């Protein structure tokens, strides 16, 4: 096929698809580098007291355009008064990956809820969605690197977002757990001990 035969709409579609693929590859390389550095202990987690509500609003802002485009809702629930000793950039990266995962596995009209609360010795952050849910066979494998479910052929992904989130959360002495019901949605719960403050 000669270049002159291409319709402008075909060229634009090809350019858009190429750009999406390049973004996906760049994200893969960046995530691989981050995980490798975390594994090697070459990343210094610089912790400061950070306001959780401010962090969650930043995450909401980061995904607001995508959520609008996909006609999905991002909902925040939690008090303005909770702070956590953490590396804001790294923890935001971890929660970003979880929210992105929720957006990837929800449909038009679905909602993603980010909630946070404080207990006597921990801060808890949850990301809930009412999407397709995680198949029971996959639930114990979702934090493994490069794991791709045979049940999620309709969504692209490399299988690094959730393992990276887990590594970052563990670098903050936190724990992440996932619970899901097929066809009803998933809940990712992160707990960070605060008793050592």
Residue ranges and their predicted role:
Residues 173-174:
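Conserved glycine-rich
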Residues 20-25:
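Short alpha-helical segment of the dimerization/phosphotransfer core of two-component systems
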Residues 109-121:
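Short beta-strand/loop element within the Bergerat-fold HATPase_c
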Residues 129:
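Acidic ATP/Mg2+-coordinating residue in the GHKL
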Residues 10, 40-45, 83-86:
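Conserved micro-motifs of the catalytic ATP-binding
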Residues 134-146:
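Short conserved segment of the HATPase_c
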Residues 46-49, 68, 73-83:
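Conserved catalytic submotifs in the C-terminal HATPase_c
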């Amino acid at each position: 096929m000669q270049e002159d035969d291409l319709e402008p709409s075909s060229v634009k579609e090809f350019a858009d698809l190429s750009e999406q693929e390049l973004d996906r590859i760049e994200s893969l390389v960046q995530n691989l580098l981050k995980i490798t550095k975390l594994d090697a202990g070459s990343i210094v987690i610089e912790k400061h007291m950070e306001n959780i509500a401010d962090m969650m609003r930043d995450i909401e802002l980061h995904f607001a355009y995508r959520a609008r485009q996909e006609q999905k809702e991002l909902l925040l629930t939690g008090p303005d008064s909770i702070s956590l000793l953490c590396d804001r950039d790294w923890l935001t990266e971890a929660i970003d990956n979880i929210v992105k995962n929720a957006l990837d596995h929800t449909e038009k009209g679905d909602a993603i809820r980010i909630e946070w609360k404080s207990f006597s010795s921990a801060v808890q952050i949850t990301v809930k969605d009412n999407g397709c849910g995680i198949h029971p066979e996959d639930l114990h494998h979702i934090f493994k690197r490069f794991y791709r479910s045979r049940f999620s052929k309709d969504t692209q992904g490399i299988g690094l977002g959730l393992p990276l989130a887990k590594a970052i959360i563990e670098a903050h002495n936190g724990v992440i757990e996932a619970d899901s019901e097929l066809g009803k949605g998933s809940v990712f719960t992160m707990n960070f001990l605060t008793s050592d403050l």
